[in-house]
Design a protein with these regions (language model features):
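Canonical positions in the second alpha-helix
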Residues: 28-29, 62-63, 96-97, 130-131, ...
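Residue-level recognition of tetratricopeptide repeat
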Residues: 36, 69-70, 103-104, 138-140, ...
Length: 270
C-alpha cells in the first residue's frame, strides 16, 4: 500500500502535539459536548500535563467509546500507556491509530520509538523509514537520528553511514527538533564534535519550556555516543554517556537508551 504525504494533516498533528490545555479549559469543552472525541482527547492531554496519567488513559478510553474511529484518542492513550510502563498496550493503540489514519507519520513514529526502546530495533527502522515517506524534509531530522543510531546499535555501520544520504541537512528544522538537527549535522560532518554542544546558544534556540535544555541534551549526548562508537573511539563514546548521566532526564528517549550502556560501563550501579 502506498501512503501519501498530507501537509494539512501534518499541521493538524503539530497542533495536537504542541497543545497545553488546562484541565479547566478541557472540562469546558466537555460541558459543550461530552460525546465529542476531540474534547476527550483535550481532556486526556490536560490530565497528563498535571501528572495524572491513569486518569488521562481513562479519558482517552471514554473518547474511544464515544467515537471509536477518532484516531488521536488511541494515540493519546498509547502515549500515556508508555508513560506508566504498559508498552505492549501502547504499541497496540499506536497500531490501531495507524490503521485508522495510515498517512499520519506521527503514529508510525511513536510506534517506532516504542518498539525501539523495548528491544525491537530492526522492526523500528522499518517504521521510521515509513515516516520518511509521509513527512516533509524539515521533519526528517528525528527520523534520520533514530535510523542512524539504530544501525549503530545493531553494529551495521555501513547502513548507518548510507542513511545520512536520505536527508538534506541544510533544511531548517522546526524549533522542537533542535537537538535532532544538531545530531544529524554532526553525523554528516557539518558540525565538529567540539562545537556540537553550545549551552548558551541552546538556551536561546530550544522551545521555551522548563527543563527543555536538559531534555535536548539527553538525546544529543546519546547521539554523540553513537557517533564516537561508529568512528571507533570507545573512550570518547563512554565519556558521552557519563556526560549524559549528569543531565539525566528520566523518560527522555536518549536517557532510556543510555541506561543499559551506563550499567555495562559501571557508570550506573546495578
Amino acid at each position: 500500500m502506498k501512503f501519501v504525504y498530507n501537509e494539512e494533516k501534518n499541521e493538524e498533528m503539530r497542533h495536537i502535539l504542541m497543545m497545553q490545555p488546562t484541565v479547566e479549559e478541557a472540562e469546558a469543552l466537555l460541558k459543550k459536548d461530552d460525546t465529542d472525541g476531540y474534547a476527550w482527547y483535550v481532556y486526556g492531554t490536560a490530565l497528563s500535563l498535571v501528572g495524572k496519567n491513569e486518569e488521562a488513559i481513562e479519558a482517552h478510553s471514554h473518547g474511544i467509546a464515544f467515537d471509536p474511529f477518532y484516531a488521536p484518542n488511541y494515540f493519546g492513550r498509547g502515549r500515556r500507556d508508555n508513560a506508566v510502563g504498559r508498552h505492549w498496550q501502547a504499541i497496540a493503540d499506536f497500531t490501531v491509530a495507524i490503521h485508522l489514519d495510515s498517512d499520519n507519520w506521527t503514529y508510525w513514529y511513536y510506534r517506532a520509538t516504542t518498539l525501539n526502546l523495548h528491544g525491537h530495533v530492526e522492526e523500528s527502522i522499518d517504521d521510521f523509514k515509513q515516516c520518511m515517506h509521509l513527512s516533509e524534509a524539515s521533519e526528517h531530522y528525528p527520523l534520520i537520528h533514530w535510523i542512524y543510531t539504530s544501525y549503530v546499535e545493531l553494529g551495521k555501520f555501513d547502513e548507518a553511514r548510507k542513511c545520512l544520504d536520505l536527508i538534506d541537512a541544510t533544511v531548517e528544522a522546526p524549533q522542537m527538533d533542535y537537538g535532532y538537527c544538531r545530531a544529524v549535522r554532526l553525523y554528516k560532518g557539518m558540525i565538529k564534535p567540539e562545537d556540537y554542544i553550545d549551552i548558551p546558544t541552546m538556551k536561546k534556540a530550544v522551545l521555551p519550556r522548563e527543563k527543555r535544555v536538559e531534555l535536548e541534551l539527553n538525546g544529543m549526548y546519546y547521539g554523540l555516543y553513537c557517533y564516537w562508537t561508529l568512528h571507533g573511539e570507545p573512550e570518547k563514546a563512554a565519556q558521552a554517556i557519563r556526560d549524559l548521566q549528569k543531565v539525566a532526564y528520566p523518560g527522555a528517549f536518549g536517557y532510556t537508551k543510555s541506561i543499559p550502556i551506563a550499567k555495562k560501563l559501571g557508570i550506573i550501579k546495578e
